[in-house]
Amino acid sequence: AINNTVDRVHQSMEAFIHNMNTIHSRGGNQVVFSSINYGTDTSAEGRMVIEELLKATIEGLGTRGEVPVFPIQIFKIKDGVSYSEADYKRAMEDFDAAMEGKVEFEAPNFDLFLKACRTTAKALFPNFMFLDTPFNQHEKWDASDPKRYRYELATMGCRTRVFENLNGEKTSLGRGNLSFTTMNL
């Protein structure tokens, strides 16, 4: 049953990437400029989605494996969740074994971090965001909170940091861009 589920999730991630790169719905002739942030979900289901999205990204689009531009992918790095210095040292001791899943790590998603690095090397995405950087931290973030994503920074597109809020709680939920503006000076 689990193999069937993995196959279905993989096919869903392939479809997601395909649709984000082919559905023309912006002004009738552009694909949706889309972004997805991930890397901190440690549930079995969340890990499966992340892993299959990374695999589908490496496979690329079509029979030639064209690198997908969308969605812009951002892998969130959080100490103790998707990274630890001890795990880094352990992975560097036997990198091939680490990449093959033969090394035990402390951080539950460190293996996904390694796979994200491999994916970036082959397909340019995901980008990486460090949640422990002082200006990206949220005082309410707690590793034991199943809804900790409410207190995680997110980015949209190539560069828009969605987090701070002048008129309410600091969160990335329910926030986004309505329009872009270009100024030629």
PLM regions: where:
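Conserved catalytic cores of very large enzyme subunits
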Residues: 1-185
